[in-house]
């Protein structure tokens, strides 16, 4: 069994209600959670510490997803990235291709979906760190 306790997760979303819900779920799982509502806050957090997983919402107004992902990759290539989405995964696969999104989290979601995401992201992050 994977030890998910103390897994470092950074949440980026402009909706405080969604942010609070995700924080609560991740805390129940045992993750250490940092959350931000602004892009500059997200990058400040990323520059100041290591994270195993970044979760962000596709629907953040004005967010250039491809540019955002490119910037994250320059900071840490071994970090898993998950995007919260509302449409079927095929839409995002066609739109973003190999842009660095490792996981899609389809809304609405609950504890079990987030737990599965965190488990898979943790395993993936470990593989990336071992390979680098």
Feature map (PLM): residue ranges:
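Two-component/phosphorelay signaling modules centered on CheY-like receiver
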Residues: 15-34
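Acidic, metal-coordinating helix/loop segments flanking the phosphotransfer/catalytic sites
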Residues: 35-53
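Acidic catalytic/metal-coordinating carboxylates
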Residues: 38, 64-67
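Active-site residues of response regulator receiver
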Residues: 57-59
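Short amphipathic alpha-helix used as the core "switch/output" element in two-component signaling
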Residues: 66-78
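Alpha4 helix (beta4-alpha4-beta5 surface) of REC/receiver domains from two-component response regulators
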Residues: 67, 87-103
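A short, hydrophobic beta-strand element within the central beta-sheet of small alpha/beta folds
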Residues: 78-90
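C-terminal output helix
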Residues: 109-119, 126
